[in-house]
């Protein structure tokens, strides 16, 4: 699951 609110770096 992708964590929401984190910038995709």
Curated annotation (Swiss-Prot):
<comment type="function">
    <text>The light-harvesting complex (LHC) functions as a light receptor, it captures and delivers excitation energy to photosystems with which it is closely associated.</text>
</comment>
<keyword id="KW-0148">Chlorophyll</keyword>
<feature type="modified residue" description="Phosphothreonine">
    <location>
        <position position="3"/>
    </location>
</feature>
<keyword id="KW-0602">Photosynthesis</keyword>
<comment type="subunit">
    <text>The LHC complex consists of chlorophyll a-b binding proteins.</text>
</comment>
<keyword id="KW-0597">Phosphoprotein</keyword>
<protein>
    <recommendedName>
        <fullName>Chlorophyll a-b binding protein</fullName>
    </recommendedName>
</protein>
<dbReference type="GO" id="GO:0016168">
    <property type="term" value="F:chlorophyll binding"/>
</dbReference>
<keyword id="KW-0472">Membrane</keyword>
<keyword id="KW-0460">Magnesium</keyword>
<dbReference type="GO" id="GO:0009522">
    <property type="term" value="C:photosystem I"/>
</dbReference>
<feature type="modified residue" description="N2-acetylarginine">
    <location>
        <position position="1"/>
    </location>
</feature>
<keyword id="KW-0150">Chloroplast</keyword>
<dbReference type="GO" id="GO:0009523">
    <property type="term" value="C:photosystem II"/>
</dbReference>
<dbReference type="GO" id="GO:0046872">
    <property type="term" value="F:metal ion binding"/>
</dbReference>
<dbReference type="GO" id="GO:0009535">
    <property type="term" value="C:chloroplast thylakoid membrane"/>
</dbReference>
<keyword id="KW-0603">Photosystem I</keyword>
<keyword id="KW-0007">Acetylation</keyword>
<keyword id="KW-0793">Thylakoid</keyword>
<dbReference type="GO" id="GO:0015979">
    <property type="term" value="P:photosynthesis"/>
</dbReference>
<comment type="similarity">
    <text>Belongs to the light-harvesting chlorophyll a/b-binding (LHC) protein family.</text>
</comment>
<keyword id="KW-0479">Metal-binding</keyword>
<keyword id="KW-0157">Chromophore</keyword>
<keyword id="KW-0604">Photosystem II</keyword>
<keyword id="KW-0934">Plastid</keyword>
